[in-house]
C-alpha cells in the first residue's frame, strides 16, 4: 500500500534509498539528542533468573559465541548471509557491524544507563507494568 511515513528496521536501514524512500528522522540520533548522548538500546541477550547457578555459565557461552563471531568476521558474515534478504557481502558486513561489536560484549557504563533509562521511560508510559530488576553480566 501507500504510506506517508514508516519505521525502517533491520536491513531496510541500509537499502531504503534503493526503494525510493527518504530518511525523515533517524531514531538513534533522536534518542541520543533527547537523552544526553546515550546510545539507543536496541536489543540484548537475556538469561532467565530461574536458571540460578547456571547463569554465569550461560552468560559465558553467549560471550564466547559473540567473541568468536567478532574474531572470525568473514566466516560470520558468510554464515549470516543465509538470512541477509538480498544484501551484498559489503552491506551484510556493515549491518552486522552496526549491531554486533564490542558493545555487544560490554554495554559500557553509558549503555547500561541507557537500558535503565529506556525501561524507566517504558514503565512511566505504562508500556511495561513494573520496572524489572537489571543485572548486567560482564
Residue locations for each model-derived region?
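Pocket-lining segment of extracytoplasmic ligand-binding domains
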Residues: 1-82
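Conserved C-terminal helix/tail region of periplasmic/extracytoplasmic solute-binding proteins
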Residues: 121-138
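Secondary-structure end/capping motifs
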Residues: 52-121
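Short secondary-structure transition/capping segments
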Residues: 33-41, 115-126
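Flexible, active-site-adjacent loop/turn segments at secondary-structure boundaries
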Residues: 22-29, 43-45, 98, 103-105, ...
Amino acid at each position: 500500500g501507500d504510506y506517508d511515513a514508516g519505521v525502517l528496521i533491520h536491513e531496510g536501514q541500509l537499502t531504503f534509498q534503493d526503494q525510493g524512500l527518504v530518511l525523515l528522522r533517524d531514531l538513534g540520533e533522536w534518542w541520543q539528542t533527547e537523552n544526553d548522548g546515550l546510545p539507543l538500546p536496541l536489543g540484548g541477550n537475556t538469561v532467565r533468573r530461574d536458571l540460578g547457578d547456571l547463569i554465569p555459565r550461560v552468560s559465558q557461552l553467549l560471550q564466547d559465541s559473540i567473541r568468536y563471531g567478532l574474531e572470525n568476521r568473514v566466516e560470520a558474515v558468510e554464515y549470516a548471509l543465509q538470512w541477509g534478504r538480498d544484501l551484498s557481502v559489503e552491506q551484510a558486513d556493515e549491518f552486522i557491524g552496526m549491531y554486533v561489536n564490542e558493545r555487544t560484549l560490554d554495554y559500557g557504563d553509558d549503555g547500561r544507563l541507557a537500558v535503565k533509562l529506556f525501561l524507566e521511560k517504558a514503565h512511566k508510559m505504562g508500556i511495561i507494568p513494573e520496572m524489572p530488576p537489571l543485572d548486567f553480566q560482564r
